[in-house]
């Protein structure tokens, strides 16, 4: 079982450089087995061109390393907080992809300017606040997760599977590692489109609510009809 989990997480991680979402080692994917509570995550600081399935690190939700010769990603504590708080997710991605990270560094959420955005994410993609000095000094990675969880406590984390951390970068999630990667790719494209839209028309307004609703709910609503349902 753990070998299969490692293989899936390896394959998901290898999608990041394929889609241009990472430079050097600037990113990670994890996936959790909810039955055991174990998750696999990319090891810290290992180049993607040297990565192998057996290099994936198995962790539990208490932060204990169950299996692996390497240290886990430095963002592991953030992943743990999200898995503990968001029971309907099975995979998480963190990158420093340039367009999404540019929005994060600007401290801005990404407005929904069109249907590409609305097809996948309901509403503005949020940018959460900076951590305080105390939060950074106490437990930076854990408190990054705590901050994200706190932001989403009265929001639908399934309808909005992405967040920007101010001055840091994006996190996305999904039902498994591959879906979280898919959402990271979508986020990067949407971030690029939004930035270009504002360059072309600095006075642009968000897409009409009825259009955003139509595109999101035709794909994700109770009566969804986008794609094949069988």
Task: For the regions a language model picked out, list residue spans one by one.
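Glycine-rich flexible loops
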Residues: 1-230
